[in-house]
Amino acid sequence: MRSDAIKRRLYSKAIFIIPFWILSIALWFSSGSVYKIDSCMIDNNKTTCIPYTISKYTDFNSNSQLNQFNSSFILFQIIPINILCFLPLLGYMYILASVLKVDLVKKAFTIFGIMMLITIPLFLIVSICIFPLNLRETLCSDLKNGFIKSNIVDKGNTTICNLKESFNYFKGSFSDTTTTTTTTTTLEWGITYNWYFIIATIVFSFSMLVIVLVLLIKDANTLNNGDGQNYSLFEQENDENFEDDDPNDVIESGLDLWGRNIWYNYTKKPMNSILLSIFQLFYIGSYFSLYYFGFKFNLIPFFINLIILFISYYNLIFDGIRDNYLIKRMYRERSNDVNQFIERVKKIKPKVAIVKKPNKEGGKSSSGGGGGGGGGIDDGIEAILEPRLLKSWLDQSELDYLMINDDDDKYKPIVELTIIEDFKTTSQLPIDAISLLFVKTDLSNYYIITNKKKRFIQINRGLHSFLVLIGLSGLFNILYLKRLILKKSITIKTLFEYNNR
């Protein structure tokens, strides 16, 4: 079934990202220990380290150079590592965009992700190479200016900054030997690195970069199926071609997932997606709460929200896919593809009810046969044929409009396909054919028109894609669809307009 094909394709890509997501969370929890500014006084006659007045990250005078040094170091170390922890989420959204064929969103994620994957290791490498070289000058300047109160008495040339000996890479020391005693006091200071975090972060970043590039190459190789046609999610799955299925079976089996009926009902009930959006806001908030309030009591809600995030995206894919994926395929078509689409629609022969109006002379229509009419309708309709298979493609000259001849469902949406330039006719399809229309056309515009109030609203496909991918499709429903679908008596048309450029 189509849903199974989507799940298999999604899982086959997500398996690359999920382990890195878990690793990134572990890195984020430990990012506070990646580096530290250590300082203490060590008495040669003792084994203990007396804490020096320079503390980790804080207690720096705002005017001191060491404060600026610390801020710059956080910029180059802590922030990139925290950003890195969000990259798997970015990768997961890239996977969704890839599976759902949201090319614009996928390209944006790809560019941003590659930039971050290249930039973060460079930030770490630069910080390792440059910052230790500047620390001595920074510390000495602050000592001379009195911004740092040393526990060691400053006596002439005995201070750190006047020593002629060179400092080692990360730590420096000096001895204060008085004439009356032989006690030597050593001040050690510098940046201490946990190298395994640095190395793990760099390896992690480049590994993610390699995986992204591999996925890009793989997608590029499958974009064309050999005939120059657009790659379709359903064309090949376990060596089976869905297009070879019986057309009627395609329609019937697809209605549970791809049917317009279900999508229509789904858009009228945005509460589920709103709740999922709220949960995801809690998930984002848990990051900040963990950062500011510690890791202990926040661990449980963090992982609960993480699970909710997975569940919400799962539901958004396999519930919201009807109002998301099918729209994503509506562009990049060529004129020959539209022609091929029309030919395929003709083969399906969906059941429709044909409504004929009297001709200008007031006579009866000769094409009103085929199954029992319902003449004498007050609104000027001459006859309504019983539902039957549409055996030929009817253009505007042969048919005024099509509608579902069902008292309970007669106000359901009707799909209208307008093809400009190469195809000058306007044709309408009934609701039964909507699944093929959505899947097989990549037309440029997506509109909703309400006939009752003559409102015309263009839906921004890019905004829709973004809101769905971040779990806020409920917001989209409120902004666009909730105010359109007011009650059942409103007829809604979906207009697809193709411009051959």
Swiss-Prot record:
UniProtKB keywords: Membrane, Transmembrane, Transmembrane helix
Entry membrane topology: Multi-pass membrane protein
GO cellular component: membrane
Location(s) in or outside the cell: Membrane
Keyword Transmembrane helix: yes
TM region(s), chain numbering: 14-34, 73-93, 111-131, 197-217, 274-294, 297-317, 466-486
Predominant location: membrane
UniProt superkingdom: Eukaryota
This protein's name: Putative uncharacterized transmembrane protein DDB_G0291480
Source species taxonomy: Eukaryota, Amoebozoa, Evosea, Eumycetozoa, Dictyostelia
